[in-house]
């Protein structure tokens, strides 16, 4: 009896030691506002790479202010990784664009290019906004400070000859902007993200909004000026009652710090492109189908993390 009890105690102690030896790793993915596309996609990826896909890993999607805030959080150690627009990541790494005059974020590294983010200019029906130029004199939200959308909105306004002084500018999260459009206290707002965006779909279902085209020579000039931007079309009926809309797009990227462990990021990258992750992405969000391994290093702009680079070499995406 005593021997049996002793054996049980030894086994229990051994399990406790083993449990302590395999401590959990927590890995945050900073995303964006809960009404956008980053947050649900981040949740799908976090679930796909967590234990058992990567042993002892607990990944979580964290709501945030968006691209600029995510890069700053990674740099400051407030997040292990995050989503960023390709232009914001490049500007941060090189100390140019919106990061001009600030220290370069030289440790910023790419895990994967994810999907194209489409520029949305959402306008209240009855506000008589048919083009970007019609925003003059209107109440317009450019998104909140720290977001990539704010950077893009300012670039778009400038391209069409509209200054912030020409509009009644507000700086709101997309869901808050949508609520103000709904109660007629805002005329339009910018959103950059994968379609369909849930908050915009809800607005469109009421029949109260239009998606305004961002096209023409002004858009073509932006594409030539910024290599990250591409001509895009939001297909008809993506949003109820809205026809096909010409617009622009920029790549959404998953970025991290060079300081993150090489083996850990290798395993995370491998899990991202596993069959289980594929099923989750395909079934979990309309934009999930656009996240494909073949495009993982397209339009990189910043260096790959050593762990991600190792994986892409193994599967033949890199030589």
Question: How would you label these PLM feature ranges?
Answer:
Residues 7-16:
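Bacterial N-terminal signal peptides
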Residues 138-155, 227-290, 294-296:
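Ligand-binding clefts/hinges and TM-proximal coupling segments of bilobed small-molecule sensing domains
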Residues 86-88, 97-98, 127, 164-260:
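Pocket-lining segment of extracytoplasmic ligand-binding domains
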Residues 172, 176, 182-183, 193-211, ...:
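An extracytoplasmic/periplasmic, membrane-proximal ligand-sensing/linker region
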Residues 15-23:
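Sec/Tat signal peptide C-region and signal peptidase I cleavage site
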Residues 24-92:
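N-terminal (or domain-start) structured segment
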Residues 26-52, 56-57, 113, 117-183, ...:
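Bilobed "Venus flytrap"/periplasmic-binding protein-like clamshell domains
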Residues 79-115, 194-197:
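Acidic, polar ligand-binding/catalytic clefts
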């Amino acid at each position: 009896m005593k021997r049996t009890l002793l054996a049980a105690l030894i086994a229990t102690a051994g399990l406790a030691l083993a449990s302590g030896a395999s401590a959990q790793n927590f890995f945050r993915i900073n995303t964006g506002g809960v009404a956008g596309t980053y947050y649900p996609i981040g949740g799908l990826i976090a679930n796909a790479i967590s234990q058992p896909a990567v042993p002892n890993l607990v990944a979580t999607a964290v709501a945030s202010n968006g691209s600029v805030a995510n890069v700053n959080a990674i740099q400051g150690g407030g997040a292990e990784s995050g989503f960023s627009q390709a232009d914001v990541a490049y500007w941060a790494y090189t100390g140019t664009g919106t990061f001009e005059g600030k220290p370069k974020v030289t440790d910023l590294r790419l895990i994967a290019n994810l999907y194209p983010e489409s520029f949305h200019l959402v306008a209240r029906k009855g506000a008589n906004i048919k083009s970007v130029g019609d925003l003059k004199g209107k109440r317009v939200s450019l998104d909140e400070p720290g977001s990539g959308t704010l950077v893009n909105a300012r670039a778009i306004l400038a391209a069409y000859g509209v200054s912030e002084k020409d509009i009644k500018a507000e700086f709101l999260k997309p869901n808050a902007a949508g609520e103000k459009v709904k109660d007629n206290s805002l005329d339009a707002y910018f959103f950059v993200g994968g379609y369909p965006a849930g908050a915009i779909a809800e607005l469109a279902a009421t029949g109260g909004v239009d998606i305004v085209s961002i096209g023409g020579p002004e858009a073509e000039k932006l594409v030539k000026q910024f290599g990250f931007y591409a001509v895009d079309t939001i297909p008809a009926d993506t949003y109820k009652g809205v026809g096909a809309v010409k617009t622009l797009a920029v790549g959404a990227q998953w970025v991290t710090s060079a300081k993150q462990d090489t083996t850990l990021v290798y395993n995370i990258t491998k899990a991202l492109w596993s069959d289980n992750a594929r099923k989750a992405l395909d079934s979990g969000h309309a934009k999930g189908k656009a996240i494909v391994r073949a495009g993982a290093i397209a339009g990189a702009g910043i260096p790959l993390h050593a762990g991600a680079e190792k994986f892409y070499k193994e599967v033949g995406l890199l030589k």
